[in-house]
Amino acid sequence: MDLKPRVIRSEDIYRTYWLYWHLLGLESNFFLNRLLDLVITIFVTIWYPIHLILGLFMERSLGDVCKGLPITAACFFASFKFICFRFKLSEIKEIEILFKELDQRALSREECEFFNQNTRREANFIWKSFIVAYGLSNISAIASVLFGGGHKLLYPAWFPYDVQATELIFWLSVTYQIAGVSLAILQNLANDSYPPMTFCVVAGHVRLLAMRLSRIGQGPEETIYLTGKQLIESIEDHRKLMKIVELLRSTMNISQLGQFISSGVNISITLVNILFFADNNFAITYYGVYFLSMVLELFPCCYYGTLISVEMNQLTYAIYSSNWMSMNRSYSRILLIFMQLTLAEVQIKAGGMIGIGMNAFFATVRLAYSFFTLAMSLR
């Protein structure tokens, strides 16, 4: 007989996420961590995209500009999103506290099995996929420099000295670019894994709430008092979920708008680079992996954003599926008001304009294709 208590722990999903912040020097009071945070802020978050942008202005051909534009846009928006999330860490922690409270409400074997076999597994797959995609993108970029031939920097960039003066200066500059882009990727892992991972957990908790709602009044020994208590507890769970949604709207309002712009630009320019400016196999591999990374960066967030809306819409049916017909008028009145609350459409928007869902994903892909056709016409 299995005597192990059935519990779910949403915070376990976020262990790797908080590790990213620790590696970047945040969420710690140690002096060395604060010093590391200062160094990364100056030389990576601020200076790294600036030196890439200045390098673009120094390029003389359209091909070189197109080659440098994807990573420049990616690093700029990585810093932009990282700053946005950094100022929202208190809200992110508040969301995690609400998740812990909702975890305590999942007591049945059915709820625990669903969360652990579906929600938790999918959320873990999300952050692992980002690590693989971004890691491969970084490795292919480094390989394109080390084995691609020539004496070129990792990316077109401006330095306040002659990079080609000596071998030592050149390789120090390349080392800075490799270290900088690796830390920028670490920042992007924190930026991009959080939205889809959290959306997945929210959708999972909405499904658990639907399970509890549909079971209200179905037990053979449930009294009117116990049934009413279960309804009030479910209403409180719904309130917490809506609070999480409001916090997510605040947290992702600006950062996800930057995400959509960055993805649209990068997908289109990367396609142009693959077709016209990739001059060796390493470059083709790099741009191909980079293109897949850009798609992966956007798709999970939009998919689980839509899933939240779908699961929220199912709550009304779950309430109706409960045993409400044998209850008194007071209970039915509360139930009816609760049903009306669940009819409201739930959607998280980027910039207060773009709903984070599959419609936005396909719109971004269409925008990228429009940029691509424009570039083809200007060729």
Swiss-Prot record:
GO biological process, one term: signal transduction
Bilayer-crossing regions: 38-58, 65-85, 130-150, 166-186, 257-277, 282-302, 356-376
Family membership noted in the UniProt record: Belongs to the insect chemoreceptor superfamily. Heteromeric odorant receptor channel (TC 1.A.69) family. Or2a subfamily.
Gene: Or33b
UniProt KW keywords: Cell membrane, Membrane, Olfaction, Receptor, Sensory transduction, Transducer, Transmembrane, Transmembrane helix
Keyword Transmembrane helix: yes
Cytoplasmic topological segments: 1-37, 86-129, 187-256, 303-355
Tissues of expression: Expressed in 15 cells in the antenna but not the maxillary palp.
Disulfide bond positions: none
GO CC terms of this entry: dendrite membrane; membrane; plasma membrane
Subunit structure: Interacts with Orco. Complexes exist early in the endomembrane system in olfactory sensory neurons (OSNs), coupling these complexes to the conserved ciliary trafficking pathway.
Note: The atypical heteromeric and topological design of the odorant receptors appears to be an insect-specific solution for odor recognition, making the OR/Orco complex an attractive target for the development of highly selective insect repellents to disrupt olfactory-mediated host-seeking behaviors of insect disease vectors. Odor-evoked OR currents are independent of known G-protein-coupled second messenger pathways.
Name this polypeptide is given: Odorant receptor 33b
Function: Odorant receptor which mediates acceptance or avoidance behavior, depending on its substrates. The odorant receptor repertoire encodes a large collection of odor stimuli that vary widely in identity, intensity, and duration. May form a complex with Orco to form odorant-sensing units, providing sensitive and prolonged odorant signaling and calcium permeability. Involved in the behavioral responses to pentyl acetate and pyrazines.
Major localization class: membrane
Record's bilayer topology term: Multi-pass membrane protein
InterPro entries found in the cross-reference section: 7tm6_olfct_rcpt (IPR004117)
Organism: Drosophila melanogaster
Subcellular localization(s) per the UniProt record: Cell membrane
GO molecular function terms noted in the UniProt entry: ionotropic olfactory receptor activity; odorant binding; olfactory receptor activity
